[in-house]
């Protein structure tokens, strides 16, 4: 999982979901797991 300042480019990938957990924003992608990221 990467920690990124901006998730905009990742959320446009096919299969990406934006999720809020414990006050943090995550992008999870079951199709391409290397695009997992947290905003921070």
From Swiss-Prot:
InterPro entries: Ribosomal_bL36, Ribosomal_bL36_sp, Ribosomal_L36_bact
Ribonucleoprotein is among the record's keywords: yes
Pfam family, one: Ribosomal_L36
Single GO MF annotation: structural constituent of ribosome
Biological process according to GO: translation
One GO CC term, this protein: ribosome
Cystine residue pairs: none
UniProt entry keywords in alphabetical sequence: Ribonucleoprotein, Ribosomal protein
Source superkingdom: Bacteria
Presence of the UniProt keyword Ribosomal protein in the record: yes
Family under the similarity heading: Belongs to the bacterial ribosomal protein bL36 family.
NCBIfam families for this protein: PRK00831.1
Name under which the protein is recorded: Large ribosomal subunit protein bL36
Organism of this sequence: Corynebacterium jeikeium (strain K411)
The organism's taxonomic lineage, starting at the top: Bacteria, Bacillati, Actinomycetota, Actinomycetes, Mycobacteriales
């Amino acid at each position: 999982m990467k920690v990124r300042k901006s998730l905009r480019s990742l959320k446009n990938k096919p299969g990406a979901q934006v999720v809020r957990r414990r006050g943090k924003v995550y992008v999870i992608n079951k199709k391409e797991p290397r695009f997992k990221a947290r905003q921070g």
